[in-house]
Amino acid sequence: MTQSLPSIFIDNGNCEIQPYVSLADMTTFRVGGAAEWFIAPHNLKELQASYAWANEQALPITFLGAGSNLLISDQGLPGLVISTRYLRQRTFDPETCQVTAYAGESLPKLAWQAAKRGWSGLEWAVGIPGTVGGALVMNAGAHGGCTADVLTEVHALDKDGTVQVLKPEHMAFQYRSSILQQSPKPVLLGVFQLHANQSAEQVKATTQSHLDHRLSTQPYDWPSCGSVFRNPLPRTAGWLIEQSGLKGYSLGGAQVAQKHANFILNSGNATATDIFNLIHYVQQKVEENWSLLLKPEVKMLGKFPQIT
């Protein structure tokens, strides 16, 4: 990648695509290289224009929400990175108890706004440091609830730029997975069916309880991506890692958290390669001890070292 390229303006000059933009501060791990091209659209029109431009140039496209559950290579990402950080809008329909939220909307904020209205269904989402778009792609969940439980429809872009409406039966939801991982499409918004079957105080109390539990059991002192591995039910990844004696283990600037072993921390000077190598080391040790290969929940983007 080169740092000397000028910005490109599309959509009659209204939409700026910038070259060589660092992505590290846009991820919760605080690591990673630069985007070859980058844009943070302020509305759906700019999103559609930038998406069309990248397709015309035959560039790879990466969508970036809150940057949680994500590890970006130190070498950065080729093509266009589209950040949804400005695509934040939500509407609550009191007649249907449905919530419509844009892809960049904060999941915890959405959960709290629903709770204040006494609408149940999103209490589980309060401690997940992600966006609506990421939740739809990953089928995010916690505390026994998940995105699939409340989803009514997803609006996404086809490659030709037309809006496609996906119903739950089109989403192929599984544990931390959806069709949008196998066949990626830009997510515009999601519509969620909630329920006004409790008082606002009850819903807020449950929401606060979930948040308190998360804060008391998970590390927040250093940057991380959230849970690194999927839970191989009925066991948990954290328990297997802890029983393998890996709590506190470090490689470079990456460390297995003492508070919760399914978290890897950037202890201050980690690189993406440090974190990648520690993920692989944890997998090796757990497999040696338990004959079970932990599957990463964190999504890895870009080029990483070959594992032999």
From Swiss-Prot:
InterPro entries: FAD-bd_PCMH, FAD-bd_PCMH-like_sf, FAD-bd_PCMH_sub1, FAD-bd_PCMH_sub2, MurB, MurB_C, MurB_C_sf, Oxid_FAD_bind_N
EC numbers on record: 1.3.1.98
GO CC entries: cytosol
Major localization listed first in the record, in broad terms: cytoplasm
Active site feature: R176, S227, E297
Biological process, per Gene Ontology: cell division; cell wall organization; peptidoglycan biosynthetic process; regulation of cell shape
Keywords tagged on the record: Cell cycle, Cell division, Cell shape, Cell wall biogenesis/degradation, Cytoplasm, FAD, Flavoprotein, NADP, Oxidoreductase, Peptidoglycan synthesis
Pathway per the UniProt entry: Cell wall biogenesis; peptidoglycan biosynthesis
Cofactor list: FAD
Location relative to the cell: Cytoplasm
One GO molecular-function entry: UDP-N-acetylmuramate dehydrogenase activity
Location of the FAD-binding PCMH-type domain: 30-213
UniProt KW Disulfide bond keyword: no
Keyword Flavoprotein (UniProt): yes
Catalyses which reaction(s): UDP-N-acetyl-alpha-D-muramate + NADP(+) = UDP-N-acetyl-3-O-(1-carboxyvinyl)-alpha-D-glucosamine + NADPH + H(+)
Classification via PANTHER family: UDP-N-ACETYLENOLPYRUVOYLGLUCOSAMINE REDUCTASE
Family: Belongs to the MurB family.
Function: Cell wall formation.
Protein name as catalogued: UDP-N-acetylenolpyruvoylglucosamine reductase
Lineage: Bacteria, Bacillati, Cyanobacteriota, Cyanophyceae, Acaryochloridales
Gene name of this polypeptide: murB
